Amino acid sequence: LVGSEMCIRDRPESTLMSELKPIMKDYPNVAITSYVKPTNIELRLTIIAGAHADIKATFDRVTKAILKKEQQYYLGMGNDFNLANEVVGLLKQQKLKITGAESLTGGLFQSTICSIPGASAIFDGGFVTYAAEAKISLLGIPASLINQNGVVSSATAQAMADYSRKKLDADFGIGFTGVAGPDELEGQPAGTVWIGLARKGQPTISKQLRLAGYLGRQEIRLLSVQYGLQMLLKELRK
């Protein structure tokens, strides 16, 4: 048997497999299996060696057909695919810099970026602003914005991304705010997360996550970082 892996994000497993069923009918000797991971779905393509004269060509055709259908949800190839490595690589290729402001993740995003060799080319520094007072004093976010919208909000996540980007004159700024748990914050349950993403010259966007509170603090923080990296990857591939 010869296999190949592909990572897909933001797709319900049943929807994804239903969409791929017509494609796979054209390749009866290729089996497709899905594995649900915390932040993505891993597709494994398997073919019996010798079933085709050119195994690689068959995989290439199947992969191309799947990508044509699911390109906007595609993360990368291989079971050792590293999302942070991909993001850092694209930032370097495009000569862009990133910074961030983190609340619930407590610097985990910045640590993840810095774990990749060559990160100094795309990262000058960032902020850990755990308390509301730090968001105000270090980033310059107006107290009125936080008082009106709350710490755990789209507005605050976007402001964290905006103000951190402007402070360090970076191309990208990313902000993480939310509830790592186990207790609620501002009436929001554990697992509620907002991620803001600012890019120079473009409107700032945000994404809300509703992660299961039973996952625990560390899992919620880790998943938040992975979803933030996915947002970045999507922007860098535009």
What are these regions (language model features)?
Residues S4, T39-L43, K207:
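Short amphipathic alpha-helical segments
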Residues L1-I8:
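Short, small-residue-biased leader/transition segments that mark boundaries at the very start
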Residues D54-K238:
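Short alpha-helical segments enriched in small residues
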Residues R11-V30:
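Short amphipathic alpha-helix segments
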Residues K37-D60:
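Terminal amphipathic helices with adjacent charged low-complexity linkers/tails
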Residues P28-S34, D171-G175:
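A short linear hydrophobic-aromatic micro-motif
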Residues S34-V36, I47, V193-R199:
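Short beta-strand elements
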